[in-house]
Amino acid sequence: ALDYVINIHNPKRIAFRDKTLAILEADMNINTDVKLKYSHKKKSVSNSYKRFKGEIKGLNKLNAIAAKQDLEKKFTEAALNSSPHSEKYGDIIFKLEKLYKEKEKYSMARAYFLEFMYYSGPDMMNFAVGFRPIVGQLSSHSENTVEVDKAVARLKLKSKNYFKNLHLPTEKKLFAQLLQVYYENVDKSLHGKAFDLLEGKYKMDYKKFTNYIYSKTSFVNQEKCTNILNNMNESTAIALKKDVGYQVMNSIATAYYEMVKPRQAEYANDIEQLSKYYVEGLQILLPNEKKYY
């Protein structure tokens, strides 16, 4: 787990945010309007960016990976040399390493999904994803109108800041370049249908694909979005499903919720169970050793 954090998870998320910050800084340096609009986003992206870097620095300073590996080696040797405990504890480290390796592609897909959709990606995706539960409720003929009304109210409030700070040239750069990062780093088996049009008609031309999406979607048109939110019903939900911006967002989100999140949860549960045995075994076999869980 430490090796994953230091050498894979944090560096990948840092690289993603590097891309976001580079785009924002370049546009902010030449346009005071962009500087005003995106100062909060830049600060938000920078905060976790620094935290990810700090975690790597701190763990490396502690030589945490080597210490953890040394403890695991001692544990396995002690287990294998103790006949009452060899069967229960002897292969725990091997099993844990195998699970972490298998879980890796799902963990990284989750990380890229969160970065692209919520934390440091294009604002249009972050805005559009708020419509997903509303469309789901209305499409299923749900009678839970209270929840729909609450979600619509939240989006109306959010839309004010969203459109106030939206600068399309910057937004389109974020979408094109970060979509490419997502595509190239998330395992293709977990892409879902999000990239069919990009791979087919647009032949992996991210700029042309982006121009198409932003020229057709209602999510960058304040008047259209206001009208949608003021008239949210089943017919509106059906129409939103045909919006190209919604389709990109929804296909990425559907791939995550159907293919990534369940598998990651399964691996997390298996790892938790084995980790309990590992901690139990440490107390029995190496009671005086400093622990690195």
Language model regions located:
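Terminal presequence/propeptide segments associated with secretion/organelle targeting
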Residues: A1-Y292
